[in-house]
Amino acid sequence: MIKNLLNKRKYITVSSVELNDTELSEDEKPNIPSGMWSKCEKCAKILYTEDLRENFNVCPNCGHHFKLGAYERIKYLTDENTFVEFDKKMIGRNPLDFNGYEEKIKGYQKKSHVIEGVVTGEAYIAQRKVVLCVMDSNFMMGSMGTAVGEKITRAIEYATKNRLPLIIFTCSGGARMQEGIYSLMQMAKVSGAIYRHGRENLLYITVLTNPTTGGVTASFAMEGDIILSEPGCLVGFAGRRVIEGTINEKLPDDFQTAEFLLEKGFIDKIVQRKDLKQVITSLLRMHEVDYE
């Protein structure tokens, strides 16, 4: 008996290879709902998606700002149930008969749950009425085509007519190549509407989000009276490799970041997403004018 007590207990060993090769049946597989967990693109930490949403879609570990859909951003920013959307059914056409373009638009509409690359409308922020344009990178990387340009222009004209402050959240890969020159002309059209809005001494705030590039950067993104940005945003016109290849020089590591632009005086302030509503409210209050 004593001998048995002193003997080491023996275990049946199973190799990890055998375990890894074993196929679990459907009943044995863990039932984890799709979308329950998210992985941070910067620090690779696995995050509970509900906690991430409660933290404004910002990683609590490293502060990385996840991409936000247009309607999510509007929900975070505006007073509850005050947003009224403009031109809800306006979608892009295919002016150049670009092969497969209509199918691509339909695919992105299904995938992103928006019908175009921008959502526009009016809402209240801290009980102050504003006009909002929020670009959505989930739809063709927020590229600017005729529908995007037209929706933004109409929203600006509405703000001008009703003497309202204008806030545009930019997020774009630039002009939409499938629409060619029709896409490029939106830069001038939107900029003209911005000019007329400014001529009436009305406030225009831009908020740069990741990424803001190409024709959007070269036009209305950098025309705001006040230019804010979320941390770590890519902001530029041409791509890094294109510039380095053209000038045959190595660019700084922080080139085309919001922090670099702040240092050089191109933007006014970098704001954490959780603080955006408070900062914008303060700006609206400072520039408040009674026109009656």
Curated annotation (Swiss-Prot):
Organism superkingdom: Bacteria
Keyword line: ATP-binding, Cytoplasm, Fatty acid biosynthesis, Fatty acid metabolism, Lipid biosynthesis, Lipid metabolism, Metal-binding, Nucleotide-binding, Transferase, Zinc, Zinc-finger
Main location group: cytoplasm
Gene3D superfamilies: 2-enoyl-CoA Hydratase, Chain A, domain 1
Binding residues for Zn(2+): C40, C43, C59, C62
InterPro entries xref list: AcCoA_carboxyl_beta, Acetyl_CoA_COase_Trfase_b_su, ClpP/crotonase-like_dom_sf, COA_CT_N, Znf-ACC
Zinc finger (C4-type): 40-62
GO annotations of cellular component type: acetyl-CoA carboxylase complex
Subcellular location: Cytoplasm
A single BP term in Gene Ontology: fatty acid biosynthetic process
SUPFAM superfamilies: ClpP/crotonase
Record's keyword annotation contains Metal-binding: yes
Enzyme Commission designation: 2.1.3.15
Single annotated GO MF: acetyl-CoA carboxylase activity
Residue span, CoA carboxyltransferase N-terminal domain: 36-292
Catalytic activity: N(6)-carboxybiotinyl-L-lysyl-[protein] + acetyl-CoA = N(6)-biotinyl-L-lysyl-[protein] + malonyl-CoA
Pathway(s) it belongs to: Lipid metabolism; malonyl-CoA biosynthesis; malonyl-CoA from acetyl-CoA: step 1/1
Free-text cofactor note: Binds 1 zinc ion per subunit.
NCBIfam families: accD (TIGR00515)
Subunit: Acetyl-CoA carboxylase is a heterohexamer composed of biotin carboxyl carrier protein (AccB), biotin carboxylase (AccC) and two subunits each of ACCase subunit alpha (AccA) and ACCase subunit beta (AccD).
Family: Belongs to the AccD/PCCB family.
Function: Component of the acetyl coenzyme A carboxylase (ACC) complex. Biotin carboxylase (BC) catalyzes the carboxylation of biotin on its carrier protein (BCCP) and then the CO(2) group is transferred by the transcarboxylase to acetyl-CoA to form malonyl-CoA.
UniProt protein name: Acetyl-coenzyme A carboxylase carboxyl transferase subunit beta
Lineage: Bacteria, Bacillati, Bacillota, Clostridia, Eubacteriales
